[in-house]
Amino acid sequence: MAAAALTLRTRAAVTALLSPTAPTALAVRHASKKTGGSSKNLGGKSRGKHYGIKKMEGHYVHAGNILGTQRQFRWHPGAHVGLGRNKCLYALEEGIVRYTKDVYVPNPKNTEAVDLVTSLPKGAVLYKTFVHVVPAKPEGTFKLVDML
């Protein structure tokens, strides 16, 4: 009889725990997020990078003017022309822009260039386009002999 009373008491305790009587225990919400679908066409259409020649042959440029922008070496820096970090060419002095095709002699430390030159047939030479700035002659900047 004592065992039956104990089982009834424990069964009543279990049902009291499992059946919610308080209103707060009726609805419990947790933070959740739906799984995201996969998307393929990321990025969309982007504008061009505007690479190319900025100053043509015969144009007058000042020091610091950008002569051309490029991703790979299409034009090489010549006389009075500097090379930027992103391979852009800029004028080091003011003058007139000239483009020439010259024989390209690669740096012997550059293994890719050496491999390219050695793979060419005997007697073949590489021609590359070089950009030069011909400095403008200074006019009226003479010093008098008495001032020296």
Swiss-Prot record:
Keyword set includes Cytoplasm: no
Gene Ontology CC terms: mitochondrial inner membrane; mitochondrial large ribosomal subunit; mitochondrion
Self-association state and partner proteins as the record states: Component of the mitochondrial ribosome large subunit (39S) which comprises a 16S rRNA and about 50 distinct proteins.
GO MF assignments: structural constituent of ribosome
Organism: Mus musculus (Mouse)
Transit peptide location: 1-30
Protein name stated in the entry: Large ribosomal subunit protein bL27m
PANTHER family in alphabetical order: LARGE RIBOSOMAL SUBUNIT PROTEIN BL27M, RIBOSOMAL PROTEIN L27
Keyword terms, alphabetized: Mitochondrion, Ribonucleoprotein, Ribosomal protein, Transit peptide
Region (Disordered): 28-48
